Amino acid sequence: MRKITVTLLLILLTFTIANSQKPVPRRQIAAQVKAEFLHAWRGYKKYAWGHDDLRPLSKTHHDWYAQPLLMTPVDALDTMVLMGLKNEAATTKRYIIDNLSFDKDIYVQNFEVTIRLLGGLLSAYQLTGDKRLLALAEDLGNRLQHVFNSPTGLPYRYVNLKTGKVRGQVSNPAETGTLLIEFGTLSKLTGKRVFYDKAKRALVETYNRRSPLGLVGTRINVETGAWTNTDSHISAEIDSYYEYLLKSWLLFGDADCMRMWLQSFAAINKYLADETKGTVPSELWYGHADMSTGRRTATTYGALDAFFPAVLALSGDLNRAKRLQASSMVMWMKHGVEPEEMDYRTGEVKSAGYPLRPEIVESTYYLYHYTKDP
């Protein structure tokens, strides 16, 4: 799930549309979104060009690691193409091709670099057709694939881009199982099966370590395959594992992913779904439970969980998708903006931050796409 400053405006526009009784001037709204994107992009270019991120308050730059990897330009290029910003896209593409190198003696987090840089380069290549972007993606994929060299096939968390050395043996399902879309796409575009096979094995090995109830935990040792935290949920550290089971089936037609998704989906709905109403009225939430016993361990739901209505809609379960989206809207409307996490039984906010999460926007899009209900 990738973030950019424009997320805030998208969210505001989304809920303006949802609550409006008048026809929505779509061209006007599209122009507003594009203008906000350009505002954010120009700020980045002015104060942080050549680095990973802009710190807007101090007007300084920030790099994720010891050396910059052009996170923002790579992340934003496909958005520029989709918005028809030809000049900005051409300038950004040229800068990436001329300046981005992965031959750096730095440790990077495989999960974050995969979803942002590898995914960004692949989508930019698919939209522009420039094979130099695919060459960069393949080079990155070759450097990242060392993470899969564990005794279990579950990936280590960190890899040195230059030496291939790895570290970080305690990981989580989101990081071990959220790789197949990017690595699989790299395989399809390069014709090199190794990327697909290694990422799929990591996904399968994560699934194979589910409990007899069909649930996975929060943290796992990639060298032993033993769980170090048995809390099960759809939130941070697990969330996109479930998303990639479904989307890998839909994207690649992989029958194993279909089987794993359907079994996991049944377990999620049996042990994590919660229809108990509390002080925050709603029909459906998804809470936490112990992966081995199914015992409820927490009744929290947050901004990261709000991806799940989109997954439910994509899976064909529009009934649950609409009910859970209504819960997400309750969480949003209670304070005018969603908290990072709240207790859905008491209404107590557990984490009040708001780091511009886009998950609820994606779910709103999918629900509207399938239902046409504003």
Label every model-predicted segment.
Residues R2, A18-Q21:
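Generic cytosolic/nucleocytoplasmic N-terminal low-complexity/intrinsically disordered segments
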Residues R2-L8:
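Sec-dependent signal peptide recognition
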Residues L10-A18:
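Hydrophobic h-region of N-terminal signal peptides that target proteins for export
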Residues S20-P374:
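Glycan-recognition and catalytic cores of secretory/periplasmic carbohydrate-active enzymes
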